[in-house]
Amino acid sequence: EITTRLVGSEMCIRDSPKEQYQAFRRTTLKMRGELEQSQLGAELAAQEQVLCIVNRRKTAQELYNNLPKEGSYCLTTLLYPAHRKQLLQKIRERLKDGLPCRVISTSLIEAGVDVDFPAVYREEAGLDSILQAAGRCNREGRRPAEQSLVQIFTLEGQHVPRMLEQNVSATQSVLKKYADLASPEAIETYFLFYRTLKGDKRLDEQQILQGFEQDMEGRIFPFATAAERFRLIETPAVTVYIPQGKGEHLLARLRAGEVSKTLFRQLGQYGVPVYPDHLKTLENAGAVCQISEGIWELTDGSLYDNNTGLAMEAETGAAWFA
């Protein structure tokens, strides 16, 4: 096992980079290697407050389904945004009150979500994602770094999702060169490795490396910005709208022929992104209908669970594993 300290999601580099860097060492990184999903689930269930971030929405649902229901939550984009906001509020309240709070999430919780867990598990991903995950552990610096573990793992029998292969490869290259993954040099090297693997053009379109070139000698280390720009490189998905809460009324207006930016902006709070194979599964099960070109509505309410969101499987027996 390899152990090294991590910093939070943002680093201020001012007159004395080394001193400022030391001030942000709040967690300890532990490389766990391969775990069986049942073993991971048992470890999570044994902890009172813990965050586990995985790469697949289906994995998140499976892990959640094997946890004690009291104080356990599943956060993925299979929950529409308004629903996620409600759950996040409950999560923050339980963390604040010291109540049991076990959260299984995909990477969405790494993007600007202000939560503070005493322990974090992160499935193997790019260094940008690992450091963002670390920013959700001991965020307020109230616990010793040695007691604030960020554990990196792979799951037995699961390969790295294709869209993350180059990120993971770049991280592994950095691990061979640097003991401290959170050092500014390691992070810059990570993005340089990624640029080499991906090709300059794709990264230059998002101006990721330019940000490092401008700010490595400046005041703010642009890590959060770079991570967010990485997320702009997306995979194709369509939106299925869920007729729950205000979403039901908004969809009725859409079906009646109303079309406006305001309506679609409001509807966005009730949309779930699905990939083509997942949409096909829902179509084959007769669970969705197309209101108009590219606009889908869930018609089988039994496929939306109040805890885990839109089902990955329907009565056809097919499934989408992303």
Which sequence ranges carry the predicted segments?
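Glycine-rich phosphate-binding "P-loop"
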Residues: S16-Q37
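Conserved beta-strand scaffold positions in the cores of enzyme catalytic domains, especially
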Residues: R14, R26-L29, S72-C74, V120, ...
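C-terminal helicase lobe and adjacent C-terminal extensions/tails of nucleic-acid helicase motors
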Residues: Q39-Q47, I53, K58, E62-P68, ...
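Conserved ATPase-coupling elements of RecA-like P-loop NTPase cores
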Residues: V113-F117
